[in-house]
Amino acid sequence: MCQAEELEDVIKNTKEQRKRRKRKIEYMQQVFHEIILKTKGQGFYDFTEKTLGWLNKQKINNGILNINILHTSASLVIQENADPDVLHDLKNFFDKLAPMDDKLYKHTTEGKDDMPAHIKSALTNNQLTLSLKNKKLILGSWQGLYLFEHRLEQHTRVLSHHLIGD
């Protein structure tokens, strides 16, 4: 290659580098957040609005939201938010599935509700993954985000939110 051709290549490469620098390069962003919920014993606790309120403050328009609960005796579910009978029936079903009977379990040191709480947690979810499109969480018309508390006494629960997107 002669010097003129080499110089031409250098000029061409320099122009390409300038073009690349001028282009806006978008990177994926990540944001972490914790929602603290104080429960008053067994039942479902809707945290949809708290999550949506936090999402509305973020700069991310499209992405994935992962929510996980940092406990082994409560869980997360997406469930109908229109008819409270659904939540009542679900709680009753799980109470029958994992009854509070000390004779059934070895792990009873934290109370009669402890092992049934672990079973219910194992059968449901400890994390949820949802899509975010145009700053809107993709949920069905009747869907809400719930913490499903399996213990009888009040607890403070931590829900870790991890949003990834652009």
Model-identified regions with their sequence ranges:
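Active-site histidine-anchored catalytic micro-motif
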Residues: C2-D166
